[in-house]
Amino acid sequence: MHELTFLVRDKFHLNGYEFISGHSMGGHGALVLGLRNPERFQSITAFAPIVNPSQVPWGIKAFENYLGKNKETWAEWDALELMKRYSGEKIPILIDQGDADPFYKRELEPYRLVEAAKGSNYPLNILIQNGHDHSYYTISTFIEEQLEFHMNELKNNKTKE
C-alpha cells in the first residue's frame, strides 16, 4: 500500500489529505485500510461492506484463499475484529447499506459492526437506505452524499492545522 500511495501522490501531486471508500468486499478493504492506517486517512466510507468476513461464507472463502486456514491470522484483516479492539484516532466512518440488499443478512451483517463500534466507543454513521439493494444504482444514488461527507472531513482537518 505504501508504494502505491507514493506513486499516486507523485503522479497526481496530492496534498496528503486522503480518504478511502469501497463497495462490498472493497468496502471491507476501505474499512480495514482506514482502521489499520489512521494517520493516512481523514475519513472512510463504504457501500454495503462485508464487515466480518471471518464469519460469513464469502469472507471465509476469500480468507482461506488469501490468508490460509489459520483463523487466528484473519483478525488483522477483519474490519469487525479491528473495530473491537481499536484504540487509535477515531476517523469518521459513513456506511450506506440498502435494506433490500439480498446479501444484507447472510454476508454483510452491518449490525455486527454497529455493535463492535458501540463496544469500542467508536462513532459510526450507518445509513440503512430503504428499498435499495447491492447494485451500482444504489452507489450512484448515494455517491454524492459520500463525497460530500469526505469533503467536509477534509475541510475540517484542514482548519485544524
Give the ranges of each region predicted by the language model:
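Non-catalytic cap/lid and distal C-terminal segments of serine-dependent acyl enzymes
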Residues: M1-E161
